[in-house]
Amino acid sequence: MDQIRPGAGGREPGAGRGAVGAASPVDVVDLARSLIDIESTTGNEGEVGAWLASYLRGRGYSVLEQPLQPLAGPRSEVPGSRFPAPGPRINVIAAVGEPEVVFSTHFDCVPPFFPSRVDGDLLYGRGACDAKGILASQVAAAERLRAKGETRVGLVFVGGEERGSDGAKAANRIASKSKFLINGEPTELRLGAATRGAFRVRLRAKGKAAHSGYPELGESAIDKLIDCLVALRDAPWPADSLLGTTHYTIGLISGGVAPNVISPHAEAEVFFRTVGEHQPLRDILHRVLANRVEIEEILELPAVRMHTVPGFDTAVFSYFSDVPFLSNWGRPLLIGPGTIHVAHTDREHIAIADLDRAVETYATLAATLLAS
């Protein structure tokens, strides 16, 4: 396992740094904007990671820059990005003492990049709420605690969350004695009691091509696929008292070769947001479709139940996070400012007041956990 290594004590990017090793207040909006303005579409997180590592070293943290494997092929070649090909990638792991509580989130973002701007009381930009604003508030909370002499709080910031959580999986190889992991995602500052899992499948139907004037000579793969998709609507999907009933979306569908040809092939991708073990869902899927289509499993992530703390509002969420892949960092909690409903959109933003509230919430939550 990797170990956190002492940093070189480099210079913090930007102005306003106090003495190296001494905690000083963090301008959470300024830090968030500095992070947002560095493009870090998944696969190209190296620049923002290096900037953040230097920033934390300048504040006296020991920092590990943990290398990540490049993403393969065109997945990293995003139209409109200034990165023509996959670049270097790192996680940033930091501490000033022996962490018992760690703040964690991700600094990769979905495309397309757009820079920060402040409009009234809102901060806009890619990553404003998912999750660079969260990262800034976690750093500010850690510094607030450190100013009071509390050094048992660490920082685990990763890449790759938006495409398979490879950063979290790498970070989980680090030896840690941390007791609690506070992971940041947009929850409107409510503790996540649970998050749904994910189960994505590709359904492939095969038919027989024929002239459309003589459909009786062929077999339509599109008709087969439609029948199967309709059958999914009435299936008795698994339910859970906390998370509710499994639901799904049909995100992609394609098939056929020409309008005047009976389709020889068709396929669709179905994305289930799950509430428990996946085998019952798998059994229902195979029973309902009854060998009419080929089922290819593409993605499987578990539903997760998390630690909660009295006095904090809780909620359940339909998205998933890095939490399942960071089990070595302690009992998981999920909380962050902002709403998931504007994440991944061209209007992504966060209220500046929510960033300030998040600093206080994170500091209070960490102190409560440390006292326990």
What is each stretch, according to the model?
Residues 131-132, 136-200, 240-241:
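Acidic/histidine-rich catalytic neighborhood of metal-dependent amide-processing enzymes
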